[in-house]
Amino acid sequence: MAGSSEQQLVANAAATTVAGNGSRFAVTCGLLRQYMKEHSGSNGGGGFLPAVTAMSLMTGGADAEEEAPEVRKTMELFPQQAGTLKDTQERKEITEKAQLTIFYGGSVVVFDDFPAEKAGELMKLAGSRDSTAAAAVSDAGAAAGQPCLPDMPIARKVSLQRFLEKRKNRIVVAEPLPESEKKEAESSKRAKKDDGGASWLQVNPTLSL
């Protein structure tokens, strides 16, 4: 029965394509509809598709949940291989030990494979020594800048005496000569001119005759 119906369908499809009255899509849809009706009628109206049953992919899942508590495991997407782990350890060791160069007093000192911890301690020690040296220098400069208190009055007295002496000399030079001294100075100048400027013939004006 099924073989004869299929042959009839093929013949009908060939006839329709030869006739060319409809498109291929419409013809195919009509044939498929007719085929489904025939098979549904032969199966007693129940349809030709089998019953769908749900298949449990997780076999024994319920039993496992009842017997043991829930255990979650993390999946390692990027596993670390032995080679990569070794490389990272070697790099860490290399970074921890490096070359240390010290410039001190015009000389250069180089240490190979110097630990990082020791370098940090050395830097701290150098910083503390620099701070103490700077404090000592500042204290010495402050002490040198402060004058000695006992010497201050003596220095002031000496400078005051020098100032008074200079002031006295200026006052003496600036004062005009009295009339008697002016006359004596003029007479001495005339005597010098008359005597031809001989120094041994000059008369001392201070002598009293």
Curated annotation (Swiss-Prot):
Assembly and oligomerization: Interacts with BHLH148. Interacts with COI1A, COI1B and COI2 in a coronatine-dependent manner. Coronatine is an analog of jasmonoyl isoleucine (JA-Ile). Interacts with RSS3.
Keywords: Jasmonic acid signaling pathway, Nucleus, Transcription, Transcription regulation, Ubl conjugation
Processing and modification events after translation: Ubiquitinated. Targeted for degradation by the SCF(COI1) E3 ubiquitin ligase-proteasome pathway during jasmonate signaling.
Protein name (record): Protein TIFY 11c
Organism: Oryza sativa subsp. japonica (Rice)
Family of the protein in this entry: Belongs to the TIFY/JAZ family.
Any single biological process term in GO: regulation of jasmonic acid mediated signaling pathway
Residue interval(s) of motif Nuclear localization signal: 155-162
Region span, Disordered: 175-209
UniProt free text on domains: The jas domain (153-177) is required for interaction with COI1.
Domain Tify residue range list: 93-128
Function, as annotated: Repressor of jasmonate responses.
Location(s), subcellular: Nucleus
GO cellular component: nucleus
Record keyword Membrane present: no
Compositional bias of kind Basic and acidic residues: 179-196
Motif Jas mapped to chain: 153-177
Superkingdom of source: Eukaryota
Induction statement: By methyl jasmonate (MeJA), and drought and salt stresses. Induced by wounding.
